[in-house]
Structure formats: C-alpha cells, structure tokens
A protein has these predicted regions:
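Conserved beta-strand segments of the P-loop GTPase G domain that flank and frequently precede/overlap
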Residues: 18, 121-122
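Alpha-helical scaffold segments that mediate packing/assembly in large oligomeric complexes
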Residues: 22, 27-34, 41-104
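Sequence/fold signature of self-assembling virion shell proteins
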Residues: 72-106, 114-119, 125-220
Length: 220
C-alpha cells in the first residue's frame, strides 16, 4: 500500500487590547472586564475558524492525489472515489443517496473502508431541513404519515461559518464520519490560548504611556 503525507503548517493567533489606565480605574460597571473575557472566548473559538476555513477551501485546495479535496475524480489504487455531489440540494432522498455512496467507499485493496456517516454539517439556512430529515418521528408519503426511517442516522451540527454571509454557501451541506480514529478534521495545537497583561505600575508600557495592555496569543 502507498503512504501519503500531509503537512500541517502552524499558524499564530494574536489579539491585543490597549486601554487607558484611567478608563480601567473608572470602570465601575465592569465593561472592560467583559471585553477582556470576550477576548478569551474568541481565542477559544479560533480553532473552529481554522477548521471551517479549511473546509470552505476544499473545492480548490488539493488532496493527496493532486486533485481538489472535494472532487469526483479521486484515485485510490484502481478505484475512483467521488466525494463531491455538486448541485445536490438537501432532501431526504439526496441525504440517503450521499450516505449510501459514502458507505460504499473502498480502499486500495478493494476492501470496504466501513465508512458510516454520523454527522450532517449544515449552515443555519439548512438547519430546519436537516432536523426534519434525521429527527422527525414521522413523515408524509402519498398523503399518509409513516415512520421516518432516516431518524437518528446522523447528528445535526450547525455552523454559522458555513453561511453565505461568512464566505460559504447557504445551500451546501456535508456528511462526516466522526466515529473513526482518523477524524475528518485535525487541529494541531502547539500552544494553548494564553492571556497576558501589562498592568503593573512598574511595567514599562504603563509608565511611558499610562495605558494597560491585554493580549491573547496561541499557535496551532
């Protein structure tokens, strides 16, 4: 079997806030404290931003075989693997077809990869459709209520980062298998988010500028 290699380039994260010392001392209602807490929250969401940016670039960034990550012409041994269902609206039938296609993936040796999609990832515009498909107890067929055989097949995950306003498409949805040791996404944390501050009267920044400095940094 061939071996394939991916390079994960680390990126730095930095967010800095400079505040007049007087403003901090006069902040009786804790506004700046909330702003600083929000900086910490933003840093904890940074890995999500990196992952979704990579996902949205899947139509152009190349995979192991030199074709786009999402493509209908991946080569694996003698097999051609299609992981792109272009212009496929989110419907119950299309969901079932895409799920079945993924479960039929095989490796270089021709053996089944045993893929079992367990997450449907959608932008907010598709949340209701997705939940109806995999969470509704019954559906209507030919005017009659019948059991929904797709119920419980996938967990619905909604990501605002996938919306049209965020650079994605409100009509695009993804099926993932998160049950395996090799996950759909990898975040390589090198340095956890760290909040640093220059607020001591002896800090040079405070002495020279009469300002407090708060910052968050991370790397991954």
């Amino acid at each position: 079997a061939k071996s394939y290699r991916y390079n994960l380039d680390n990126e730095k994260y930095e967010l800095t806030l400079e505040v007049d010392r007087d403003d901090i001392e006069d902040d009786n209602i804790g506004v700046y404290s909330m702003v600083i807490d929000d900086m910490g929250q933003q840093s904890r969401l940074w890995p999500d931003d990196l992952v979704f940016a990579a996902l949205l670039a899947g139509g152009t960034e190349t995979a192991y075989d030199g074709t786009a990550f999402f493509s209908n012409s991946h080569t694996l041994g003698s097999e051609t693997i299609d992981n792109l269902f272009a212009s496929t609206a989110l419907t119950a039938d299309n969901f079932a077809a895409a799920r079945a296609a993924m479960m039929e993936y095989s490796g270089e040796d021709g053996e089944s990869l045993r893929v079992r999609p367990d997450v449907i990832l959608v932008p907010p515009a598709l949340e209701v459709k997705a939940r109806k498909i995999v969470q509704a107890s019954t559906i209507v067929e030919s005017g009659a209520a019948v059991d929904n055989v797709l119920r419980g097949l996938c967990e619905v995950v909604v990501a605002p980062q996938l919306s049209t306003s965020a650079g994605g498409l409100d009509t695009t949805w993804y099926l993932l298998d998160t049950s395996r040791p090799i996950r759909p996404f990898i975040f390589q944390q090198r340095m956890a988010p760290e909040l640093v501050s220059l607020t001591s009267p002896n800090d040079e920044h405070v002495i020279l500028r009469d300002k407090y400095l708060y910052g968050v940094k991370a790397r991954g």
